[in-house]
Structures are given as C-alpha cells and as structure tokens.
C-alpha cells in the first residue's frame, strides 16, 4: 500500500534526538580537529571520557563505556599511537596496568571539554 504521508519518518522524537546527537558529535569532532588533534574519532573520544585523571584500569574503562575489554584494548592501542595515553603499572597492584593521559592527552581533554561546552551553547 503506497503511503500518502511519509512525514512521520522524520517528524518524531527519536529521529530528532538522533539528528541532534549526530550534529553534536560532528561539532565536537570538528572542534577537536581544529584544535590540532587530527585523527581523533568519536570512538576514541568515548574511550577518553572514561579515563580518570590519575589513570584507570582497562576493565573499568570497558565497564563504564559499555564495551568489551578487547574493543577497549584496540582503542587504547590507537590512542597510544596518537600519543594521547600510555599504559603503566597500577600503583595498587603491580600485576595490573592502568591507562593514563600523556601531556598531549591532557591537552586533548581540555580541547574536548571546550568543544563540548561550545556545542552545548550552540544547542541552547
């Protein structure tokens, strides 16, 4: 049966939330890239927002991000190659590694924070 009114496909809350999130992500990535951080993806940003300033265990990052440990390790490998994180021994358990920000990673987090603030202001 042919539809006479297909407007419902884009005139609903779910579509509008998706479109707003898509724009938010694009704005955030554009700001980060303009800040000198080329090669940063939304997946990497989702990793970074789950790392504490003092460092975080891989299993904790995975739980916070809702990702598998294997996926998080792949993201950490990419972030390490970009020079924004490093792995080091956990001071509380030498058998465990934690992921910490490098000075470049700290600057990226500051840039990300400013990008998020700017994107939120544009939406307000």
Protein language model regions, located:
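Active-site phosphate/pyrophosphate-handling residues
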Residues: 12, 46, 122
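N-terminal helix-turn-helix DNA-binding core of bacterial DNA-binding proteins
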Residues: 27-71
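Short, solvent-exposed coil/turn segments
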Residues: 10, 43, 92-94
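N-terminal leader segment of winged-helix/HTH proteins
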Residues: 1-39
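Short amphipathic alpha-helical segments with heptad-repeat character
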Residues: 11-14, 18, 22, 66, ...
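DNA-binding alpha-helical recognition surfaces that contact promoter or target DNA
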Residues: 74
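Alpha-helical structural segments
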Residues: 19, 23, 50-53, 118, ...
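Charged, amphipathic alpha-helical coiled-coil/dimerization segments
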Residues: 77-124
